[in-house]
């Protein structure tokens, strides 16, 4: 039974990857839109891309402006620029990949909370979690976060926010394994900090745990 469920998870995640890839494949070569011109071409990539490539990071990574408090978000744009300069494909690929991994986190959050919280058998929990993750991945409300490159801050923050929540849940089920529990809580804290460095709204995470 355990092997069957593990295989089912693998098949579903592969199917989820295929669905998301097909859904957003037409947007991978879409041009920059709206604030992308300012955020990527002027504010971030062109100003800090050359310093990133040459290793002269004293300008790009030690000044608050224009990085503000979204250091991780802007750093991801700089890395994109270092690898592909101003070709939109790489930027869109990162956003789509983030959406896929966020959907995976949603799947595991749903699976664990349903199995443990509602005391359902693993097969039923797997079915409900799969539907939940599928609805999340296909929900058109996320299309802006995926297609709009400058909205990556939302996608990154959401991924780390939900990862912090998942890690906290996993840690809470490790009462008899202190070391494992500590490591999951440490991972949760790390993801929480990464979420804040992506978008400031992640500061609500401690309240969400109450």
Question: Model-predicted segments: where are they?
Answer:
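Polytopic membrane enzymes that build or remodel cell-surface glycoconjugates and lipids
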Residues: 1-210
């Amino acid at each position: 039974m355990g092997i069957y469920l593990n295989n089912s998870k693998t098949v579903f995640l592969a199917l989820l990857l295929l669905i998301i890839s097909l859904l957003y494949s037409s947007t991978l070569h879409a041009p920059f839109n709206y604030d992308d011109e300012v955020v990527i071409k002027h504010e971030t990539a062109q100003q800090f891309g050359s310093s990133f490539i040459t290793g002269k990071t004293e300008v790009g990574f030690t000044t608050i402006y224009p990085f503000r408090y979204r250091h991780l978000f802007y750093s991801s744009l700089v890395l994109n620029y270092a690898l592909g300069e101003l070709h939109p494909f790489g930027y869109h690929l990162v956003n789509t990949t983030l959406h896929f991994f966020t959907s995976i986190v949603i799947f595991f959050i749903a699976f664990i909370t349903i199995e443990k919280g509602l005391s359902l058998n693993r097969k039923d929990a797997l079915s409900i979690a799969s539907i939940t993750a599928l609805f999340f991945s296909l929900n058109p409300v996320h299309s802006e976060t995926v297609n709009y490159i400058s909205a990556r801050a939302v996608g990154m923050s959401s991924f780390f926010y939900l990862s912090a929540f998942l890690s906290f849940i996993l840690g809470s089920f490790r009462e008899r394994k202190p070391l494992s529990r500590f490591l999951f809580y440490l991972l949760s804290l790390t993801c929480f900090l990464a979420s804040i460095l992506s978008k400031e709204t992640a500061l609500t995470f401690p309240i969400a745990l109450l």
